[in-house]
Amino acid sequence: MAWRGSEVEAGAGDASRARGRLAAFRGELYRCLTARADELFELGDAVLCSDGPVRVLAGLSLVPGHRRGHGAVYDALNAGRVDVPRLRWAVGAVPLPAWPDGRIRLAADVCAWLRPEARTSPERLFCHVHGRGRNAGQMIPGWPYSFVAALGPGASSWTAPLDTVRLGPDDDATQVTAAQLREVAGRLERAGAWRPGDRDIIVVLDCGYDVIRLAWLLADLPMVLCARLRSNRVFCAPPAPKPPGMGGPPRQHGAPLRFADPATWAAPAVTGQASTARYGTVQVAAWNRMHARLCKDTAWEHHPGTLPVVEGTLIQLRPARLPGYRELKPMWLWASGPAAGPGEVAVLWQAFLRRFDIEHTFRFFKQVLGWTAPLLRDPAAADRWTWLIIAAYTQLRLAAPLAADLRLPWQRPQDPGTMTPARVRRGFRAVRETVATPAAPPRPCKPGPGRPKGSKNQHKAPRHDVGKHTTKRWKRTKRRTRAKQAG
């Protein structure tokens, strides 16, 4: 990126370099806003300079430094334009969290912008929301967004969001995630964050992803996928050699390993234990070259020829304790590396534990930055607002070394390098005064005529259904299920 050179020339001191990086990113962000740029830029600053959590979008027009009215706020989101490919490059050019081994850890997850009452908003899907009780989850209409973020070492509430894509009614979540990870990996390589010869990038996922299919789609990339599995899964070992003289095709599946049946667990290839502060002593076991049986009735329906055998490393974690007095159950992970040694197994499961840091980022987006606060009708406007939130969070990452600890009297002091995102946001207004603001002041204008007094709206917005568009495969599977239930 062009702005990366300016950050190096910003000065000799650490504070000067950090201020130069922040100013350069803000300038590049402004150039990514191709329509309503001034208002969109000031809107992002208002999110960061607000005294408390963002509750109402129009209330950002009252934040000091915002020079336009509340009508301009919604007009910018509805009629503005954001050069998303260029903004992706700007966000990816920011230095990633550094690990001691220099290896990059990424996390992919889906977070929903719930819109249950927005009947006039198109492209809403049913999003799963966890309840407090057991089996209390609900399916609520909303816009699901797939995020990819870089993780940092140690317990931290910081991540580095790199990309987001809204899932539509016609999208296959696995294919969208694969394309998203492929694009992020290529962008990191072109930006110099990953170079040929470096160790493979680790991507951690939750159990909602089809990690087997993802590993097959991304087999040509220097990437290791590590995902949590549900406790009812069954995996197979490599097949044993056929006895001499026995005909027929070669075997594809060996002895099954059922997660719910310990009697089927063969001797693991890797065993060990590690001490953690949160989970106590964790017992680790790993089986190499384990694969799952694939079926043509699922997403592999249109796969040409024989279904592939995607081998990986199966990892079992047995913690000594869990937060919240929950029942102790083993956690199962599957990594796309077929034969991981003890060191690689430890790196993989410890990287997966850092996946929960992205939950802090989602909570900060919603509860503090007001990601889901606007009542927007157009999903394109929601996409613009989402990228503004990511750009605002990136500015907090760059401003972390510069922000003062403006703590409340009952809060503990924090060092500049360890402040939380909420604490950095509290001091961002003072940091903003030390860097340039490329947004131009508003020009004087007169209000428009508006709707004539006493007239009613004659063009009502259309109503839209919720959910994915049905396919022939889904209908055929539904018929088969009904036939089996009938007898």
Q: What annotation goes with each model-predicted range?
A:
Residues 47, 76-156, 161, 165-166, ...:
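Active-site-proximal, Lys/Arg-enriched surface segment
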Residues 1-33, 119, 155-487:
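Single, function-defining residue in the core of a domain
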Residues 39, 52-55, 68, 72, ...:
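Generic alpha-helix structural propensity
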Residues 60, 148, 391:
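A residue-level signal for conserved active-site and pocket-lining positions in enzyme catalytic cores
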